[in-house]
Amino acid sequence: MNADIDDVLALVRPDLQAFAGYSSARSAAVQGEVWLNANESAWANPADAAGNSRRYPEPQPLALREGLAALYGVTPPQLLIGRGSDEAIDLLVRALCVPGRDGVLVTPPVFGMYAVCARLQGAALIEVPLVDTEDGLRADLDAVIDTAKSRNAKLVFLCAPSNPAGSDIALDEIERVATALRGQALVVVDEAYVEYAQRPSAATLLAAHANLAVLRTLSKAHALAAARIGSLIAAPELIAVLRRCQAPYPVPTPCAELAVQALQPAGLARTAERVATVIAERERLFAALPGLPGVRRVYRSAGNYLLVRFADAQAAFDTLLAAGVVVRDQRAAPQLGDALRISIGSPEENDRVLAALSARRAAA
């Protein structure tokens, strides 16, 4: 084991570094024909026509793990599957942060689960706000590095592309943060929307930076939000520790089977087509929205959404809702008291957004 890996494993809570976790019946590497080791029913439920649900699922379904590893360009030992990215975020905070001692650094306004998990664990929440610039709401990475060092951050979450701001972080900048915080913090890059950013994943940096981890999901570009398939990509040694901290059966069999089918070539080709459509539609709305009544600013985005400031965000929200269009009200988020986040839908759905907001001019 090299020194970099030693440094990363030293970030794990001391009381969990030798933690064995729970050994489930399915985790035992045994073969047989009559399975009487897990107290399961010998008969399928009448509602289970295929008869596949009476057995517990694989803790980490092999076919899915291999398919995801191939998709993300990593090896299966580098990958942990969980119930969406949320579970991976929670696992990281619980496994690394000692309550009352360690901190979790975030860059608000940003995805709220980082803060939720930190507070549930009793970890200090350290905030380095995004900076509103001509190029958008962007992470101040110098401040991130300095604050992480001075405030004892154990985890640094970089949402790239950022939700809801839409700004991205270049790989060389991510690498700079990981290098600066080597030995002190795990830098976690949340790439839930990276398919829309048209850049390589930060997973390409893992070989050189053991204190880097990457979150991926099938919920967005791959259109499997209900299946709750998220992945954490990191050093195999860290993945092994987190696996011991994870619940025994995190991935239901029907969800795993659906995801495996989605990762076949035909499914991936269709996903790529739809991502291209979303990117084109995002640029169409980015160009059209600034000319509509009440729109103050539209932020350029690398995700499948646009952050929009309005002269009267409540009125804009109500106008869209009256037209049957539901968007995300961001006014409770820091710096976003006048903003809504609009997901990029189908061309027809996006036309309804533009028509509803344009109608405000006619009404005026």
From Swiss-Prot:
- GO BP: L-histidine biosynthetic process
Q: Which UniProt keywords apply?
A: Amino-acid biosynthesis, Aminotransferase, Histidine biosynthesis, Pyridoxal phosphate, Transferase
Q: Which residues carry this modification: N6-(pyridoxal phosphate)lysine?
A: 220
- Which reaction equations make up its catalytic activity? L-histidinol phosphate + 2-oxoglutarate = 3-(imidazol-4-yl)-2-oxopropyl phosphate + L-glutamate
Instruction: Supply the CDD domains for this chain.
Output: AAT_like (cd00609)
Q: Name one GO molecular function term.
A: histidinol-phosphate transaminase activity
Signal among the record's keywords?
no
Which cofactor does this sequence's record say it needs? pyridoxal 5'-phosphate
The cross-references to InterPro entries, in alphabetical order and at most eight, read: Aminotransferase_I/II_large, HisP_aminotrans, PyrdxlP-dep_Trfase, PyrdxlP-dep_Trfase_major, PyrdxlP-dep_Trfase_small
> Which enzyme class, named as a word?
transferase
Tell whether Transcription is among the UniProt keywords.
no
Pathway per the UniProt entry: Amino-acid biosynthesis; L-histidine biosynthesis; L-histidine from 5-phospho-alpha-D-ribose 1-diphosphate: step 7/9
Q: Which Gene3D superfamilies match?
A: Aspartate Aminotransferase, domain 1, Type I PLP-dependent aspartate aminotransferase-like (Major domain)
The protein's Enzyme Commission number: 2.6.1.9
Q: Which family does it belong to?
A: Belongs to the class-II pyridoxal-phosphate-dependent aminotransferase family. Histidinol-phosphate aminotransferase subfamily.
Assembly notes: Homodimer.
Protein name, entry field: Histidinol-phosphate aminotransferase
Q: Which species is this UniProt entry from?
A: Stenotrophomonas maltophilia (strain R551-3)
